[in-house]
Amino acid sequence: FTNLSYYKTFDSRNGEERFKSYFAINANKRFGVGFYIDYLYGRGLYASQSTAFFNGGLFASYRGDKYNMHFIFNNDNLKMAENGGIADDRYITNPLDMAEGKKEYKSYDIPTNLNKVWNHNTSYHVFMTQRYNLGFHKEKTDSVTKDSVRIIQEFVPITSFIHTLQVDLNGRKRLY
């Protein structure tokens, strides 16, 4: 399974772009692996309002008779500019007074309270679970056609040992 998507809205000054990718494959009937990527970049309508989000992950699974494993790794990286709001409300409440003789002005020309202030959040998540089954094999008949019978070995689990690992790391930076 593969899916690639690209979205773009508005122009290069205040538009948004998003790229998404999903990939998964089964190597055989027991083992599968895949990844995903999601990247979003928005420039914002006002000054110092851009955002950049990157999310990605890897995953894998194995399902055997005696051993099972499921694994996932996620990474989230979020970077947002902070503008503290519009510096003077009259740009919204009385725009003609603030246009300085111009007929109109653009939203990104409106002064904001803050510039060059950023929030940067990152997080990493790992989850893995394993299971080992103890048991025995027994013979089972399997009819291939009307006139033939095949004997196969089937595993019968009696008890299991399970191990789970989870790690979550979160960080935040504020850049002025």
PLM ranges: what are they?
Residues 1-23, 44-45:
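Short strand-turn segments of transmembrane beta-barrel domains in outer membranes
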Residues 4-8, 37-39, 71-75, 159-169:
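Transmembrane beta-barrel strands of outer-membrane/channel proteins
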Residues 7-11, 40-45, 78-80, 170-172:
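Sequence/structural signature of outer-membrane beta-barrel proteins
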Residues 21-25, 35, 58-64, 126-134:
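Residues on the lipid-exposed face of transmembrane beta-strands in outer-membrane beta-barrel proteins
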Residues 28-30, 62-67, 156-158:
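Strand-connecting loop/turn motifs
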Residues 30-33, 66-71, 137-140:
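Repeated loop/turn-to-beta-strand initiation elements of outer-membrane beta-barrel proteins
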Residues 43-55, 59-124:
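Outer-membrane beta-barrel translocator/channel fold
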Residues 111-165:
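Outer-membrane beta-barrel transmembrane strands
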